[in-house]
Design a protein with these regions (language model features):
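Walker A (P-loop) phosphate-binding motif
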Residues: 18-72, 176, 186, 197
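Short, flexible loop segments at boundaries between secondary-structure elements
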Residues: 233-237, 276-304
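C-terminal accessory "lid"/substrate-recognition subdomains
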Residues: 139-253
Length: 304
C-alpha cells in the first residue's frame, strides 16, 4: 500500500514539474540534437549507446558534444577518459541540458549535440530520440517507480517532441543491439576468466553502484564465473571509493569485480586515480550494433 501511495505521489509531482518547469522549448537553430533515453530508472545502457553513437559520428568527421547531468559525474568522467584521444568529442556536465544545448548551438562549434539521457526533459524539442526498450513501453501506474522501474508512461512522450523517435529493443532474441562483456581485467591486464577456475581467490565478489546490478551479475555468471557475494550500492554513490577500499582491505584473498563507471569514482574526488590492488577487476562492456541498424541510424542522423 505504501508503494502505491508513493507511486501516486510520484506521478502527481512528475506531471506538476513538467507543467511548470519543463514546458516545450524552442528547437536548436544550427546543430543536430540527439537524445538517448529509456523509460527505466537506470541500467538501460544509455551511456554505452551514447559512446557508440559518438564514436560512429566522429568516425564520419563530425564534431560531437555529449551532455551529461551533473548528478551523473561518474558517467561524465568515464566518457572523458574514453574520448581523451578524440578532440572532436567533448563532454559537458550540466543541470540544465536545454540551456546548455542552446548555448552550444550559438557557438556553432559542433555538428551534433548528444544528450546522455534527457528523455524526460520535454523542453528538448526537434530532437532525434533513441529510446532503449528492455520491456514494452509502460502504460500503467503500477509500472512506475517505486512499484515498477519506469520513470514515465508512454503517453508522456507522445506529443511534446516534434522530432523523430526511434525505439530500439534490447531484450529479446531478435535484438539488433547487444551490450556484452568484453573483458574482466586487473591492473596487470590479467583476465579473471582465465584465473578464476583455480584456487587463486577464496571468493569472487561483485561490488558496484550502477542502475541495474542484476544484469551485470547475470552477464558475469554467463562467462562461467561463480559469484560468492554481491554488494550493491546506490547509483552514482559518492562514497563508493571509501567503501570499496574498506572491503578490499578486509578481504585481501578475495577478488572484487567493479564496472567502468565504478572505476571512474576511484579518484575519490581528488582527480588522481587511487592505487589498484591485483585483486580488483574491472568489467568492461562493449556495444554491438547490428549492421542493418547501424546503417539505419547513420542514415537517420546524416541524411535526414
Amino acid at each position: 500500500m505504501l508503494r502505491l501511495v508513493l507511486a501516486i505521489c510520484y506521478r502527481a509531482l512528475y506531471r506538476l514539474h513538467h507543467a511548470i518547469c519543463l514546458r516545450s522549448g524552442n528547437p536548436l537553430g544550427h546543430l543536430r540534437l540527439v537524445v538517448v533515453g529509456s523509460y527505466r530508472t537506470g541500467g538501460a545502457g544509455k551511456t554505452p549507446f551514447c559512446t557508440w553513437l559518438a564514436e560512429t559520428l566522429s568516425a564520419q568527421g563530425k564534431r560531437v558534444a555529449i551532455l551529461c547531468h551533473e548528478y551523473a559525474y561518474d558517467e561524465a568522467a568515464m566518457l572523458r577518459e574514453h574520448f581523451a584521444a578524440k578532440p572532436q568529442v567533448k563532454i559537458f556536465t550540466t543541470r540544465n541540458r536545454y540551456r546548455l544545448a542552446h548555448e552550444l548551438d550559438r557557438t556553432k562549434e559542433f555538428d551534433f549535440i548528444l544528450c546522455d539521457d534527457g528523455f524526460e526533459d520535454s523542453r528538448l524539442v526537434g530532437a532525434t530520440t533513441f529510446v532503449l526498450l528492455w520491456e514494452n513501453a509502460p502504460t500503467r501506474l503500477c509500472e512506475l517507480w517505486p512499484l515498477g522501474n519506469a520513470r514515465s508512461l508512454a503517453k508522456d512522450h507522445s506529443s511534446h517532441r516534434s522530432g523523430h523517435t526511434v525505439e530500439i529493443r534490447c531484450n529479446d532474441p531478435a535484438s539488433k543491439i547487444r551490450f556484452v562483456l568484453d573483458n574482466i581485467t586487473n591492473k596487470k591486464d590479467e583476465d579473471l576468466r582465465s584465473v578464476q577456475g583455480s584456487a587463486h581467490y577464496r571468493q569472487i565478489n561483485i561490488f558496484c553502484g550502477i542502475g541495474d546490478p542484476n544484469r551485470l551479475c547475470n552477464d558475469i555468471q554467463e562467462q562461467g564465473i561463480a559469484i560468492t557475494d554481491k554488494i550493491f550500492l546506490k547509483d552514482h554513490d559518492r562514497c563508493f571509493s571509501n567503501k570499496l577500499n574498506k572491503a578490499l582491505q578486509e578481504n585481501p584473498q578475495s577478488a572484487f569485480i567493479i564496472t567502468e563507471k565504478d572505476a571512474a569514482r576511484l579518484d575519490n574526488g581528488t582527480g588522481k586515480p587511487l592505487p589498484r590492488p591485483d585483486n580488483l577487476y574491472i568489467a568492461r562492456q562493449k556495444t554491438i550494433v547490428d549492421e542493418t541498424l547501424a546503417h539505419r541510424i547513420l542514415n537517420e542522423l546524416l541524411n535526414s
